[in-house]
């Protein structure tokens, strides 16, 4: 989810209990695909989210990319449907003189009738993380006020390789090891005083299959931070994993929220 909302993911001791070699790992999305809205979407009076979406779709088309899906957090969709420009555009489109109820279905019907039809997908993910002090908490990995433009919902894969502990003869003598898919679970103990540990580990990283065809728009109207080098670390997966990798499906699922 961070890859889709930031074109990279952020690692630090605060959100990752493992080894941190780089704080921001980009997915390879070109800097020219970094977009921003004309105005902050939270300003319902001046923002024009539908026009921002159309402008990005047209810009992508000029690069040979046909956008089909517009993915955003449910809270950002709520900002879009509250904008005066959205209400005015839809009211004129349905040719209604009375009040209309702005919903995701209605907005998607409007977008489907445009020269380059697209569909809005809303997400509201939640994941558990553990920091270096082994404190666990639930976070939403999607960066707020970011909208992702995609050709296909099959965004990428989790690529994974072998784990060093698997081939350790010494470890195999003192621990029980079980491999489930690409996650290695190791269990071992000490006698005096008796202690027992269980550890799960993986040599894996999420990878966007076609970062050139992904566009991300900041909808706060502000420029991208220079530290978000979305294209500068495109070689990380190959150098990190080695030669042998296996794909894992990461297809996006639409939520029922945002109506």
Q: What are these language model-derived features?
A:
Residues 2-21:
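Short, glycine/acidic-rich hinge or "gate" loops at secondary-structure transitions
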Residues 12, 21-22, 30-32, 53, ...:
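Intrinsically disordered, low-complexity, compositionally biased regions/tails
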Residues 12-14, 80, 211:
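Surface-exposed loop/turn and secondary-structure junction residues enriched for glycine/proline
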Residues 20-106, 110:
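Extended, solvent-exposed, turn-rich assembly/linker loops in the middle of proteins
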Residues 35-44, 87-259:
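Sequence/fold signature of self-assembling virion shell proteins
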């Amino acid at each position: 989810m961070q890859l889709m909302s930031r074109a990279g993911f952020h690692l630090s001791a605060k959100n990752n209990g493992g080894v941190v070699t780089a704080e921001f790992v980009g997915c390879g999305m070109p800097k020219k695909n970094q977009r921003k809205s004309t105005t902050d979407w939270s300003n319902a009076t001046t923002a024009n989210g539908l026009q921002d979406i159309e402008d990005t779709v047209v810009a992508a088309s000029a690069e040979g990319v046909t956008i089909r899906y517009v993915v955003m957090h449910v809270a950002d969709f709520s900002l879009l449907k509250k904008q005066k420009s959205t209400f005015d555009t839809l009211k004129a489109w349905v040719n209604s003189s009375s009040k209309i109820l702005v919903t995701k279905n209605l907005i998607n019907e409007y977008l489907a009738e445009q020269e380059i039809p697209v569909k809005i997908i809303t997400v509201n993910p939640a994941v558990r993380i553990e920091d270096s002090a082994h404190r666990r908490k639930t976070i939403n990995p999607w960066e707020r006020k970011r909208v992702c433009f995609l050709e296909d919902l099959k965004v990428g894969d989790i690529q994974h390789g072998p784990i060093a502990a698997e081939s350790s003869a010494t470890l195999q003598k003192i621990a029980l090891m079980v491999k489930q898919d690409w996650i290695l679970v190791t269990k071992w103990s000490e006698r005096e005083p008796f202690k027992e540990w269980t550890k799960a580990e993986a040599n894996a990283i999420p990878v966007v299959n076609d970062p050139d065809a992904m566009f991300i728009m900041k909808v706060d109207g502000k420029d991208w931070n220079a530290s978000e080098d979305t294209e500068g670390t495109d070689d990380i997966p190959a150098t990190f994993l080695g030669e042998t990798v296996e794909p894992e499906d990461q297809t996006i699922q639409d939520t029922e929220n945002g109506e």
